[in-house]
């Protein structure tokens, strides 16, 4: 194995977020309120299964232990199960997860698990069916809930649920969410609304700090857990009376970037050092043949020298990210 990916600030990178499409069939208010619109940049197509196999093999050789498949909506790819299996071929990758809107969970989750999937994150921004419809543009609440049940039936011991925290939309519904996870092994992750190039007005209207929830959880006796090295950025809390957990993802908090352990590759093969960074490093020309792996690893390692110490969201600089479907949120 080549040396562990490490940047100029001594951060080690064990976690790859790999977008496999930017297409999504939902129209979430904070991401794609007007629905998916194809970009000219994707005309040459999304990464193939072989390209995905090669890029994940290179990252694994550089110390990556966890791969999360993102989008867009990953399950819209007809070869999604094949993609999971291709990543699973590499024993160095211990965890393969997906972030999904849950649209196809009920139908396909057992097949995904058989192919090697080890973790699931489902986006659910409200437990009220009408509000869910209003946020996502899809009347699929019951279908998504059935999908979460199907994930447990397929053998997943825990399901993570992502909820974008929005003032005057769901921030006052903590008790409803806590009741939902009291007897279910769900890690409910509240994610602070983040400003994107297309979402400034929404951000100004609905952003609320996750610290409000953290203070309330601590007041109620929830206990802060320690992070593992390949975990995502959530601060996780548990409570002896609850089967579920609460996670808080607060990108505007001081020192959020200090524990960064993840890199991103877009659905067209660009390496992004930060969700809110500029540009990206093209890897696709080195994904054509297995013989290019050494050069691919060298390019990834060299690019990491340019990773900044922090994002610049506090300065209203959202970088290249126009919406969160672009490089996988």
Swiss-Prot record:
Cofactor annotation comment: Binds 2 [4Fe-4S] clusters. Binds 1 [4Fe-4S] cluster coordinated with 3 cysteines and an exchangeable S-adenosyl-L-methionine and 1 [4Fe-4S] cluster coordinated with 3 cysteines and the GTP-derived substrate.
InterPro entries, sorted: Aldolase_TIM, Elp3/MiaA/NifB-like_rSAM, MoaA, MoaA_NifB_PqqE_Fe-S-bd_CS, MoaA_twitch, MoCo_biosynth_MoaA/MoaC, rSAM
Sorted UniProt keywords: 4Fe-4S, GTP-binding, Iron, Iron-sulfur, Lyase, Metal-binding, Molybdenum cofactor biosynthesis, Nucleotide-binding, S-adenosyl-L-methionine
Binding of [4Fe-4S] cluster 1, residues: 24, 28, 31
Positions of [4Fe-4S] cluster 2 binding: 257, 260, 274
Record's catalysed reaction(s): GTP + AH2 + S-adenosyl-L-methionine = (8S)-3',8-cyclo-7,8-dihydroguanosine 5'-triphosphate + 5'-deoxyadenosine + L-methionine + A + H(+)
Pathway assignment: Cofactor biosynthesis; molybdopterin biosynthesis
Record-listed GTP binding positions: 17, 68, 99, 160, 262-264
UniProt GO BP: Mo-molybdopterin cofactor biosynthetic process
Single GO MF annotation: cyclic pyranopterin monophosphate synthase activity
Pfam family, one: Fer4_12
Binding of S-adenosyl-L-methionine, residues: 30, 72, 123, 194
Cofactor needs: [4Fe-4S] cluster
Protein origin, superkingdom: Bacteria
Range of residues in the leader sequence: none
This enzyme's EC code(s): 4.1.99.22
Radical SAM core domain sequence ranges: 8-234
Subunit-level organization: Monomer and homodimer.
Family as reported in the entry's similarity comment: Belongs to the radical SAM superfamily. MoaA family.
Job description of the protein: Catalyzes the cyclization of GTP to (8S)-3',8-cyclo-7,8-dihydroguanosine 5'-triphosphate.
HAMAP family given in the database record: MoaA_B (MF_01225_B)
Entry-linked PANTHER family: GTP 3',8-CYCLASE (PTHR22960:SF28), MOLYBDOPTERIN COFACTOR SYNTHESIS PROTEIN A (PTHR22960)
Record protein name field: GTP 3',8-cyclase
Taxonomic source organism: Shigella dysenteriae serotype 1 (strain Sd197)
């Amino acid at each position: 194995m080549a040396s562990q990916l490490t940047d100029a600030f001594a951060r080690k990178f064990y976690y790859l977020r790999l977008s496999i499409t930017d297409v999504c069939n939902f129209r979430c208010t904070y991401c794609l309120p007007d629905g998916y619109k194809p970009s000219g940049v994707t005309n040459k197509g999304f990464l193939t299964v072989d390209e995905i196999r090669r890029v994940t093999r290179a990252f694994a050789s550089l110390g990556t232990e966890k791969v999360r498949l993102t989008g867009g909506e990953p399950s819209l790819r007809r070869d999604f199960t094949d993609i999971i299996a291709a990543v699973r071929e590499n024993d160095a990758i211990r965890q393969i997860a997906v972030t999904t809107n849950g649209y196809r969970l009920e139908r396909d989750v057992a097949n995904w698990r058989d192919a090697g999937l080890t973790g699931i994150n489902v986006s659910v921004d409200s437990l009220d069916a009408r509000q869910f419809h209003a946020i996502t543009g899809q009347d699929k609440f019951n279908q998504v809930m059935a999908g979460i049940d199907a994930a447990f039936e397929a053998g997943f011991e825990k399901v993570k649920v992502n909820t974008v925290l929005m003032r005057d939309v769901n921030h006052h519904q903590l008790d409803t969410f806590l009741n939902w996870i009291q007897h279910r092994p769900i890690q409910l992750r509240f994610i602070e609304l983040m400003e994107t190039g297309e979402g400034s007005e929404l951000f100004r209207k609905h952003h609320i700090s996750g610290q409000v929830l953290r203070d309330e959880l601590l007041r109620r006796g929830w206990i802060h857990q320690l992070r593992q090295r390949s975990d995502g950025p959530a601060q996780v809390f548990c409570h002896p009376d609850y089967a579920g957990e609460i996670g808080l993802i607060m990108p505007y908090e001081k020192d959020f970037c200090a524990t960064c352990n993840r890199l991103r590759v877009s659905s067209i093969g660009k390496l992004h050092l930060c969700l809110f960074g500029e540009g990206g490093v093209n890897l696709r020309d080195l994904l054509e043949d297995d013989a290019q792996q050494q050069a691919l690893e060298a390019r990834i390692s060299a690019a990491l020298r340019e990773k900044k110490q922090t994002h610049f969201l506090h300065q209203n600089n959202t970088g290249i990210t126009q919406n969160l479907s672009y490089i996988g949120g």
